[in-house]
């Protein structure tokens, strides 16, 4: 379900049922989707798919939530003539005047911050986290309904597009027991990816798997090949987890989609490159898990520069999750104007626009510190078009006072408590609205 969890009744719900034929011959599948109950009156979709051996297909429908307020479940039923398979997902729809539910539904979770400068106040703490500490942190996120976990990256490699990195000589260090490359990050946890997923399974949460880092802003053919190999390994190792929700491409991009190239020809080439990357990566991931969405985070600057490319890109990118609306350059359009432009192009493409809310501010030395809760609440109320709001990030910015380890400064606890108070007030407002 896109988006999952709690949503407003002002959006459309994207429902996808993915099927992979693991048999040796062509197979016919009867596929049905139901709302709440498995009966004819609750049927959303009923179709037949013929899928060749080792191939995949997906059933996809979008339905408005206007009259669906309340807690519901969506049932997928698949029959191959011999066996019947069922999957059920729950959804909560709240009454609202706007698309946003005005709360943070999840957060980035960097296993080690990519920048020692930015992560100055927590990298030494996060390094000490064991697998059990990661499980504890996932429970803390669940406590404040941040039920979507975006793993920032599964390899650490500090390089930018234009570096001479290749698939074969890639020097990055893995956060998990990868068989692709020997390098390992020097952290206490043995397999934090498994710890995060297994705990998220128990809590009914969703994990967006960060396929990266090859090199920042790099969507070249070399980067594409690396991403395919890593995505395949991640799916083979962790795809059995119920919480494995999506593939997230870690590389990020500027809002202009041209990598800030001043030369018109180079700018055009970068735009062609990013579209080709996601076209190929989407096709590759669909063969593994056809229902899984793919997400990219872009910044909100220079959005008008990319408007000639977004329609084509969004054919292959399910979720666009931009950041930086609160710090737009003076020469750019406003954050609200950028959000409205992106919402329009996503609506036209039947793609999803989520919000990567920045829960941090920069110190003079460029280290990050928790943003005051009042500023976060301001953003939650200002940008009301986003169907789902995630934040950057949980570790080092929020800290549950009941956790056995503190990652970062003491004021991270204040932000956790402040957000918890806001959440209680929001729930009360929603209850009285009913």
Label every model-predicted segment.
Residues 64-69:
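Short, surface-exposed loop/turn segments at beta-strand-coil junctions that are enriched for proline
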Residues 90-126:
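An acidic-aromatic substrate-binding cleft motif
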Residues 107, 126-159, 313-320, 383-389:
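Catalytic domains of carbohydrate-active enzymes, especially glycoside hydrolases
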Residues 130, 137-140, 187-203, 220-246, ...:
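An active-site-proximal structural segment forming one wall of the substrate-binding cleft
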Residues 144-187:
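Aromatic-lined carbohydrate-binding/catalytic grooves of carbohydrate-active enzymes
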Residues 149, 245, 324-331, 348-433:
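Substrate-binding cleft of secreted/luminal carbohydrate-active enzymes
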Residues 205-226, 246-252, 271, 277-307, ...:
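Aromatic-lined carbohydrate-recognition surfaces of secreted/lumenal glycan-active proteins
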Residues 217-289, 329-337, 366-374, 400-411:
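Active-site cleft segment of glycoside hydrolase catalytic domains centered on the general acid/base Glu
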């Amino acid at each position: 379900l896109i988006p999952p969890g709690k949503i407003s009744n002002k959006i459309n719900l994207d429902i996808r049922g993915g099927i992979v034929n693991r048999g040796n011959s062509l197979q016919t599948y009867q596929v049905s989707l139901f709302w709440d109950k498995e009966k004819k009156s609750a049927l959303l979709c009923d179709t037949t798919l013929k899928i060749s051996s080792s191939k995949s297909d997906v059933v996809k429908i979008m339905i408005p939530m206007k009259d669906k307020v309340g807690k519901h479940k969506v049932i997928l039923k698949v029959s191959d003539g011999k066996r019947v398979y069922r999957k059920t997902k729950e959804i909560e729809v709240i009454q609202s005047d706007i698309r946003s539910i005005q709360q943070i539904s999840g957060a980035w979770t960097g296993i080690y911050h990519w920048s020692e400068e930015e992560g100055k106040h927590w990298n030494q703490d996060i390094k000490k986290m064991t697998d059990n500490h990661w499980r504890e942190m996932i429970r803390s996120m669940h406590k404040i309904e941040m039920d979507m976990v975006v793993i920032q990256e599964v390899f650490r490699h500090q390089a930018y597009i234009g570096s001479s990195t290749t698939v074969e000589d890639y020097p990055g260090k893995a956060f998990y027991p990868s068989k692709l490359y020997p390098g390992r990050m020097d952290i206490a946890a043995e397999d934090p990816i498994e710890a995060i997923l297994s705990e998220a399974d128990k809590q009914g949460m969703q994990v967006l798997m960060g396929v990266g880092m090859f090199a920042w802003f790099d969507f070249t053919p070399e980067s594409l090949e690396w991403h395919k190999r890593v995505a395949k390994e991640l799916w083979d190792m962790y795809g059995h987890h119920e919480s494995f929700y999506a593939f997230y491409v870690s590389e990020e991009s500027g809002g202009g989609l041209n990598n800030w190239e001043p030369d018109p020809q180079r700018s055009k080439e970068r735009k062609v490159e990013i579209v080709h990357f996601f076209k190929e990566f989407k096709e590759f991931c669909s063969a593994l898990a056809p229902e899984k969405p793919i997400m990219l985070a872009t910044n909100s600057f220079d959005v008008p520069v990319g408007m000639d490319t977004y329609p084509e890109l969004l054919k292959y990118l399910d979720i666009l999750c931009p950041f930086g609306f609160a710090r737009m350059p003076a020469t750019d359009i406003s954050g609200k104007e950028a959000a409205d432009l992106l919402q329009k192009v996503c609506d036209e493409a039947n793609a999803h626009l989520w919000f990567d809310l920045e829960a941090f501010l920069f110190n003079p030395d460029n280290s990050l510190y928790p943003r005051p809760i009042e500023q976060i609440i301001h953003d939650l109320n200002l940008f009301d078009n986003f169907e789902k709001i995630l934040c950057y990030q949980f570790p080092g910015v929020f800290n549950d006072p009941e956790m056995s380890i503190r990652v970062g400064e003491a004021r991270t606890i204040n932000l956790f408590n402040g957000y918890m108070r806001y959440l209680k007030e929001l729930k009360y407002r929603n209850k009285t609205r009913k």
